């Protein structure tokens, strides 16, 4: 893709076998059994997101440090959660270095996160994740999807890679972004939402140019009886990393990712034995 000039994604996901991406369990004090289940032998977990307090928090949390250490010892990548929706690209595109409106620049658009955020703030959080929890990479939640935001996102990812050697970067778009993002992150979350939408979802044609290890699907509200169907959809659409749960978002009132699915043993056995293939 000739318009891309940033740091390319790594090739670590090229031969990735089907497995699980854990988008964010509750704090280890509230979900100690769930965190422990991720380290059980044979659990096909690709990575788990650590979100201490809407970020790394203001001081090291010993419970999170212990949970992260156990995951790493079990061979599971630990990713620090960063809110990428507050990367305010219009702040840079629409102002001068002095912060004055650039002549002819459009009026700033409010970001989805409810306010601007300079890159240094995001990097400060990332550095705390590295220093306190020794994370293996980062999960950029609510990552932008438009081409206009690609440059700033690529800039942020490049800085993150400088903070952590061999950092694994997952871009949590939640939908198919502009194809240029595939050259930015190691994995892209191209679906995040309810089963009622996933079962009728379509895949973007450009994803066929990349191996399944580059894509992830996160689906809540999947009934136990439709688990095999969900896994077939992921295989057909070319996503090697998945997270399916029967938990729901309660109409937007509950985080469906905070607890384990009721069929945890079933999904581990299905993916671990290659049922989806």
Set out the residue ranges of the language-model regions:
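Glycan-processing catalytic domains of CAZymes
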Residues: 1-277
């Amino acid at each position: 893709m000739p318009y891309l000039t940033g740091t390319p994604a790594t090739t670590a996901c090229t031969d990735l076998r089907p497995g699980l991406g854990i988008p964010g369990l509750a704090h280890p004090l509230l979900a100690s059994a769930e965190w422990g289940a991720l380290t059980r032998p044979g659990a096909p977990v690709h990575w788990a997101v650590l979100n201490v307090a809407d970020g790394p928090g203001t001081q090291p949390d010993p419970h999170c440090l212990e949970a992260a250490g156990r995951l790493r010892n079990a061979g599971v990548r630990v990713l620090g959660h960063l809110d990428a929706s507050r990367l305010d690209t219009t702040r840079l595109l629409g102002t001068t270095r002095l912060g004055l409106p650039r002549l002819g620049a459009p009026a700033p658009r409010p970001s989805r996160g409810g306010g601007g955020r300079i890159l240094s703030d995001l990097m400060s959080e990332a550095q705390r994740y590295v220093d306190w929890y020794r994370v293996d990479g980062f999960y950029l939640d609510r990552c932008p999807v438009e081409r206009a935001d690609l440059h700033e996102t690529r800039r942020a990812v490049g800085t993150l890679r400088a903070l952590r050697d061999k950092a694994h970067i997952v871009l949590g778009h939640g939908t198919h972004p502009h194809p240029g993002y595939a050259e930015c992150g190691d994995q892209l979350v191209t679906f995040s939402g309810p089963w009622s939408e996933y079962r009728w979802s379509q895949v973007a044609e450009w994803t066929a140019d990349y191996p399944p290890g580059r894509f992830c699907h996160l689906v809540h509200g999947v009934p136990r009886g439709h688990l095999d169907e969900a896994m077939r959809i992921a295989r057909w659409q070319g996503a090697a990393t998945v997270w399916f749960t029967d938990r729901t978002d309660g109409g937007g009132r509950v985080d469906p990712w905070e607890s384990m699915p009721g069929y945890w043993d079933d999904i581990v056995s299905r993916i671990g034995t290659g049922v989806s293939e």
